[in-house]
């Protein structure tokens, strides 16, 4: 039977090299704080307890993760990783297996960590890297047993050539860690209490020490600056792109796909290059997403098409709908089956019924559009009076002529026609034509100033130029 597990996440670092006012663990990875990714990994292991050791910006860090069931432990002075773990140990029973993670190592997976929990001694997570600069080296004896971890600043030239490095992640019993942490010394180049010195302490009391390797190259990469953050972001995105491809979502250009949340999808879906999916995104069967699209917290049903460079946020697109290109569906938009929203159309808190169309250059806000209604190019629902929003209701099979303004609150009846250029300020009845525009007037002989340098029709008896000045003699 597995011992109960307590996870300790070290998140006290200030992150000076980030050049940011935010604590390092709040830096975003795929749209979420670094620490959130580590917490998700920790909770996936089913621990009895999760402890986060914080320091710089602790209030910010805790507030950003208030929904997580964790214990917050302050490290008042940053005296090293060993000291940080020691701060959390008083709350952990001796019989618990303690897994130590880092808030700036977000790529490690639960599958990699489970073997550390299955051991009965001190289990280390190691990696082989082509350039070990900056890492602590794992030193073995002639029999291959782990004898020490030597930090970069304390390593001699021979030790620095070792390419087997310590990732910093380890597991041991709480009772053992408590004993080892009490014996730590800060007699080193940094003047800190190193957690890695637990190796020597474990060997001294006969506790087995094992080093297990990561299952994926770069999985335990830490983040100290924006360059490394960008590298980890790229690795994260490539990992998810590969998983989505394996799960049946076609990504036309996987290296140009960004996920900042989660996506569920049906069969035969395709996502073109340069698309970004944020929050919770659900794609039905056969959904086609064009290049440069941004999808945020939305549902797109079977057979719908989203054209290039469209933004869809907190919206619901029904089956068989066509949207875009260059459309913007804002929060509260619902398109029912077969509706169409075309290029340079913006919607907000609007419902378009089955088969309704707004194909060009239109704004539909706070509106209910009936089935098969057609909104001509340049139609605007004037929903805001400077203080409050008002709704527009358009009946089924209504036709709104191009360039019309519907001043809410207003209703257009079923099968009504609104003449092009109308400014509608009162309800339009069903089965009727409503026109609200001035008649066109023709002025014979008019020539625009670009042709004549003057306005109005030519007149030999006109003594006053168009500019209003005196006539030249």
UniProtKB/Swiss-Prot annotation:
Localization per Swiss-Prot or TrEMBL: Cytoplasm
EC number, as in UniProt: 2.7.7.23, 2.3.1.157
Pathway: Nucleotide-sugar biosynthesis; UDP-N-acetyl-alpha-D-glucosamine biosynthesis; N-acetyl-alpha-D-glucosamine 1-phosphate from alpha-D-glucosamine 6-phosphate (route II): step 2/2; Nucleotide-sugar biosynthesis; UDP-N-acetyl-alpha-D-glucosamine biosynthesis; UDP-N-acetyl-alpha-D-glucosamine from N-acetyl-alpha-D-glucosamine 1-phosphate: step 1/1; Bacterial outer membrane biogenesis; LPS lipid A biosynthesis
Binding site for UDP-N-acetyl-alpha-D-glucosamine: 10-13, 24, 75, 80-81, 102-104, 136, 151, 166, 224, 330, 348, 363, 374
Binding site for Mg(2+): 104, 224
Region called Linker, residue ranges: 227-247
Keywords: Acyltransferase, Cell shape, Cell wall biogenesis/degradation, Cytoplasm, Magnesium, Metal-binding, Multifunctional enzyme, Nucleotidyltransferase, Peptidoglycan synthesis, Repeat, Transferase
Domain of life of the source: Bacteria
Enzyme class: transferase
Coiled-coil zones: none
NCBIfam families: glmU
Stated role: Catalyzes the last two sequential reactions in the de novo biosynthetic pathway for UDP-N-acetylglucosamine (UDP-GlcNAc). The C-terminal domain catalyzes the transfer of acetyl group from acetyl coenzyme A to glucosamine-1-phosphate (GlcN-1-P) to produce N-acetylglucosamine-1-phosphate (GlcNAc-1-P), which is converted into UDP-GlcNAc by the transfer of uridine 5-monophosphate (from uridine 5-triphosphate), a reaction catalyzed by the N-terminal domain.
Assembly behavior: Homotrimer.
Similarity comment text for this entry: In the N-terminal section; belongs to the N-acetylglucosamine-1-phosphate uridyltransferase family.
Protein name from the UniProt record: Bifunctional protein GlmU
Source organism of this protein record: Halorhodospira halophila (strain DSM 244 / SL1)
């Amino acid at each position: 039977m597995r011992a109960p597990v307590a996870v300790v996440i070290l998140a006290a670092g200030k992150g000076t090299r980030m050049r940011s006012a935010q604590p390092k663990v709040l830096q975003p990875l795929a749209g979420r704080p670094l620490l959130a990714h580590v917490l998700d990994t920790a909770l996936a292991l089913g621990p009895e307890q999760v402890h986060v050791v914080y320091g710089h910006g602790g209030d910010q860090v805790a507030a950003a993760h208030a929904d997580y069931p964790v214990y917050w432990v302050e490290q008042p002075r940053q005296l090293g990783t060993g000291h940080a773990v020691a701060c959390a140990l008083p709350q952990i029973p001796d019989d618990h297996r303690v897994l130590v993670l880092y808030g700036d190592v977000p790529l490690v997976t639960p599958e990699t960590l489970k073997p550390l929990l299955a051991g009965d001694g001190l289990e280390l997570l190691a990696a082989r890297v082509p350039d070990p600069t900056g890492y602590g080296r794992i030193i073995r004896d002639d029999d291959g047993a782990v004898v020490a971890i030597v930090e970069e600043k304390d390593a001699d030239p021979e030790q620095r050539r070792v390419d087997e490095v310590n990732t910093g992640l380890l597991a041991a019993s709480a009772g053992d860690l408590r004993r080892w942490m009490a014996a730590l010394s800060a007699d080193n180049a940094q003047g800190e209490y190193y957690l890695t010195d637990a190796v020597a302490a474990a060997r001294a009391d006969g506790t087995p020490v094992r080093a297990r390797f990561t299952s994926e190259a770069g999985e335990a990469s830490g983040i100290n600056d924006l360059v490394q953050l960008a590298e980890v972001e790229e690795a994260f995105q490539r990992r998810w792109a590969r998983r989505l491809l394996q799960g049946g979502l076609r990504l036309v250009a996987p290296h140009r796909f960004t996920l900042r949340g989660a996506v569920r999808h049906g069969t035969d879906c395709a996502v073109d290059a340069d698309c970004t999916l944020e929050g919770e995104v659900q794609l039905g069967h056969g959904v086609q997403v064009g290049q440069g699209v941004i999808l945020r917290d939305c549902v797109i049903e079977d057979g719908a098409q989203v054209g290039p460079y469209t933004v869809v946020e907190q919206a619901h697109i029904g089956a068989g709908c066509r949207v875009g290109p260059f459309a913007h569906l804002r929060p509260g938009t619902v398109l029912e089956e077969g509706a169409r929203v075309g290029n340079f159309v913006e919607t907000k808190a609007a419902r378009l019924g089955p088969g309704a169309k707004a194909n060009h250059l239109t704004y539909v806000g706070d509106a209910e559009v009936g089935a098969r209604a057609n909104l001509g190019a340049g139609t605007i629902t004037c929903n805001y009076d400077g203080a409050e929003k008002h709704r527009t209701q358009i009946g089924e099979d209504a036709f709104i002529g191009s360039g019309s303004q519907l001043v809410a609150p207003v209703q257009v009846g079923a099968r009504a026609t609104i003449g092009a250029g109308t400014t509608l300020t009162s309800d339009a009845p069903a089965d009727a034509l409503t026109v609200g525009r001035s008649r066109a007037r023709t002025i014979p002989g008019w020539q625009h100033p670009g042709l004549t340098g003057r306005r109005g029709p030519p007149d030999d008896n006109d003594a006053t130029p168009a500019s209003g000045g005196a006539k030249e003699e």
